[in-house]
Amino acid sequence: MDFDALELLLQASLPVQLILAILIIASITSWVLIFEKYFTLTRSTDASHEIEDKFGEGEKIENLYLALKEKDLGDLEPSELILVSVYDSLMNKNNSINEVESTERLVRVIVNREEERLSKNLSLLATISSSAPYIGLLGTVIGIINAFQGLSTTAQLTLSSVAPGISEALVATAVGLLAAIPAPIAYNQFSKKLDNLINGSLAFAEQLIIQINKK
């Protein structure tokens, strides 16, 4: 931020300063969530795809299971957790209809829990994207009001009498847009990525159950 922008912020009216502070905090929060969610979903997607690819290439389920059992259960990603849980549930059993149905219910519980974990704070991105423009608009309105108040206190129309209020209005609009624009883009991309991850994990679970039942 250059000196002029900082000076403008310091000279702005208190309501506009509060609005700008809220928008700046919202923008920082948005970017922190974007980076955190990007790395979380990328890690989960890559790990799940890796185990799905190994299964699809014909690697023995038992070998995949033993490799995953060496990891901490809390470190497993959706498809990895599904493989371990399905194997524990069905392997070395008679694979009756009741056991298969019980395993399918277990898979749904795991998927729902993982979806909830991976979607954490996504709603906050949606909230920022929808509210930031209106907060910025409020700052715009206050800035325009201040500009008109500047007119009312002078007998002659001059740029210096309206410039502070107009500047406040424009800055509030710009900061509101800067806070709002990245959030919906990231939210839509992350939601799509999460849906693909969950659907892929469910499809993997079905193939896994079928394969184990053949043994």
Model-derived segments and spans:
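Hydrophobic membrane-targeting segments
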Residues: 1-53
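Residue-level signal for the membrane-embedded core of alpha-helical transmembrane segments
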Residues: 19-29, 132-135, 139-142, 177
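Alpha-helical transmembrane segments of multi-pass membrane proteins
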Residues: 23-26, 184, 188
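Predominantly long cytosolic amphipathic alpha-helical stalk/bundle segments
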Residues: 46-158, 185-215
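Hydrophobic alpha-helical transmembrane segments of polytopic membrane proteins
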Residues: 169-185
